[in-house]
């Protein structure tokens, strides 16, 4: 039995829901063959987010950690390729923190790559007709903060980990005419992502770069 830790954020920025948390709740109640799914709600708070996920890692000892976050304006599921050592918050987090141009970990390197097979994930979802695009920037808010912090602590351990951004849900996006994706499609996509991660030892070679 393999263990998968799924993390999703609480609502922030005036929203009443967060699609990442709704997705994690849905997935935690599902049964997949030979896979135990563990859900974890993450506060949108600097450093507390990292501590919450690392505590869950130590408690459950997962084989795979998939961190999920909301990305307003994106129309596809976007596996993140790299986390950078920078906090530069455009808005306050849920505890009122708003660091500007500060490192996440002062002694850490400039960046960490995801250890997920991000190109295999992207290709698998695209082949299934689910909008998916490789991303090279997780932003500079709490999503990137969590991504970097977890990679910093897990990069020497045999636990695959990485971050996935997802679009808004239709009920969030309707008022502002932003892109969205149904929860049903997100659930199907996340199931495919999990199985791709568990079944792919080495990432595949598919074009996923950008010109700018």
UniProtKB/Swiss-Prot annotation:
Q: Where in the cell is it found?
A: Cytoplasm
EC top class, as a word: hydrolase
Q: Which residues are named in the active-site annotation?
A: 80, 143, 165
Q: Which UniProt keywords apply?
A: Cytoplasm, Hydrolase, Protease, Thiol protease
The alphabetized list of GO BP terms reads: proteolysis
Subunit: Homotetramer.
Function field: Removes 5-oxoproline from various penultimate amino acid residues except L-proline.
The record's listing under PANTHER family reads: PROTEASE FAMILY C15 PYROGLUTAMYL-PEPTIDASE I-RELATED, PYROGLUTAMYL-PEPTIDASE I
Q: Name the protein family.
A: Belongs to the peptidase C15 family.
Name-wise, this protein is Pyrrolidone-carboxylate peptidase
Q: Which species expresses this protein natively?
A: Vibrio vulnificus (strain CMCP6)
Supply the source organism's classification. Bacteria, Pseudomonadati, Pseudomonadota, Gammaproteobacteria, Vibrionales
